[in-house]
Amino acid sequence: MFFRFPEDARWNADGQAVEFGVGIGEYEGVVRVPRQVFGRFIDGAVTPERCLEAYHLHRTRLERVVERKLRNRQLTDDGNVEVNGRDLRVLPRGASMAYSDFATR
């Protein structure tokens, strides 16, 4: 399976979230990462600009979470993907605690 993540990250003011596209095969969807999720990456005020900056700094990690959610068919009612704080705490299969400690810093 090849996932596609176009370079289209943007701030959604109505949803207070960073959104970006994802595709696999014929599926095309939108990933939403709410503002409060970025609080773990940002010291100080969690502004839209800083959320987008944090997205780019942690893009690979967020994309891996999205891949896992799509493989497990964890979609929202509208067929898209929403990443929450719990998704970022889940250990990948076979990962050690040392990896977990490193990944959350």
PLM segments and residue spans:
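Acidic, low-complexity intrinsically disordered segments
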Residues: 46-105
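Short, charged/polar N-terminal "headpieces" of proteins
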Residues: 1-27
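Flexible, active-site-adjacent loop/turn segments at secondary-structure boundaries
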Residues: 3, 36-40, 86
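Intrinsically disordered, low-complexity regions enriched in Ser/Pro/Gly/Gln/His and often acidic
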Residues: 2-4, 34, 48
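A short, structured beta-strand/loop element
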Residues: 19-42
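Compositionally biased, intrinsically disordered low-complexity regions enriched in proline and serine
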Residues: 4-6, 28, 39, 56, ...
